[in-house]
Amino acid sequence: IDGIKDGTIDVIASHHQPQDVDTKKCEFEKANFGIISIQTFFSNIVELSRKIPLDILLKTFSSKPKEILGIERSSISEGSKASFTIFNSDGSWDYDEKINLSKSINSPWLNWSLKGRVEAVIKGNKIKEII
């Protein structure tokens, strides 16, 4: 937390790594590392924002990675390609197998009510509304 606040840590990533059931339903020391995390990542960030301002956290997985990798920042202007997410940091949602978008189900947050809801993702001319 201190590293993010003081700028030592520049980027936070989800490290989304789905695993099939067979690689997880075994003794702990034999199980493959990794969980699904893309779908719950924003909710985890909102939880962390109780200790770190949300605007700082948003930069760690949006503009800062692009800056480090030399990727041009997106802009919202006429003629530019859209690339942004609409979210509600106060919204809540229930994460269960019915709403899970992954082929895998290895998540510690399965069947939890989570705070911080992604409403839609806009990329180019495509809009994906999240229900």
Predicted regions and their residues:
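Histidine/acidic residue-rich metal-binding segments in metalloenzymes
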Residues: 1-12
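Short C-terminal domain-edge/linker segments immediately following a structured domain
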Residues: 2, 41-47, 114-121
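His/Asp/Glu-enriched, well-ordered alpha-helical/loop segment
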Residues: 11-12, 17-87
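C-terminal cap of metal-dependent C-N hydrolases
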Residues: 30, 81-131
